[in-house]
Amino acid sequence: MNKGVMRPGHVQLRVLDMGKALEHYVELLGLIEMDRDDQGRVYLKAWTEVDKFSVVLREADEPGMDFMGFKVVDEDSLNRLTDDLLNFGCLIENVAAGELKGCGRRVRFQAPSGHHFELYADKEYTGKWGVSEVNPEAWPRDLKGMAAVRFDHCLLYGDELQATYELFTEVLGFYLAEQVVDADGIRLAQFLSLSTKAHDVAFIHHAEKGKFHHASFFLDTWEDVLRAADLISMTDTSIDIGPTRHGLTQGKTIYFFDPSGNRCEVFCGGNYNYPDHKPVTWLAKDVGKAIFYHDRVLNERFMTVMT
């Protein structure tokens, strides 16, 4: 059921060296720098995104994700969702408008998995970057690197998947698109969506709370993914795996690391979903094929390296 949460809006990542991080996210991934603030944070967006930013980089002593934000339709929805979060048992932090430049007030909470999320209704509308809103060209001609199209989702590792599932489905209005279950039917991975996309956020069971696996960015075509792989080699960027295809979600993908060790994904394609679709289920004994459809064997680094 729609509860007023629209889509992923932003992710704030911790990086060890801002200069090196910007080489990665701007020059390689192709995000556009939009602003900086007095805390030293840098605000980035992909060119098709209409709001001011979708990625915030913060220099810190250890890498990882500070929080992921979702945009809601209006202030009334934000107020109602705040009450629902409190009734669910979440502790709420109200973050003032302007704490993130160009963003309205945010309501932050912690999921049972240990990850921090936030909801907001307002963010400065800047339109797509480099193209007009009237008679727009197909794409800007001065994009860099992989020319990421949009910030798409995050994959997160933590425990208490069932309670996290209940929070995201019953309170926030997500639905289960795909899952991995063990022989007893216990869910080990859950891919949750707000839209017709394959997923907007995903969780995999892990003993330690609050771990970050990757932030993902959409590309248009398989040829774009192959070109991204070329750029990864040209820049001696640390690669995890790919190009390959997922069984889960059907995305065609490649994974690589920023200089701080945060994992990134660029992908194209993927399943679509409508409200009458039943969740796709993968069995844990076949998880190799679910994750890497071609190799059918798990890459140990993919399952064990996180920030």
UniProtKB/Swiss-Prot annotation:
Enzyme class: oxidoreductase
Catalytic activity: catechol + O2 = (2Z,4E)-2-hydroxy-6-oxohexa-2,4-dienoate + H(+)
EC number: 1.13.11.2
Short name of one Pfam family: Glyoxalase
Domain VOC: 7-122, 150-269
Biological process terms in GO annotation: benzoate catabolic process via hydroxylation
An MF annotation (GO) of this entry: catechol 2,3-dioxygenase activity
Keywords attached to this entry: Aromatic hydrocarbons catabolism, Dioxygenase, Iron, Metal-binding, Oxidoreductase, Plasmid, Repeat
Chain positions recorded as Fe cation binding sites: 153, 214, 265
Assembly notes: Homotetramer.
Name by which UniProt lists this protein: Metapyrocatechase
Cofactor: Fe(2+)
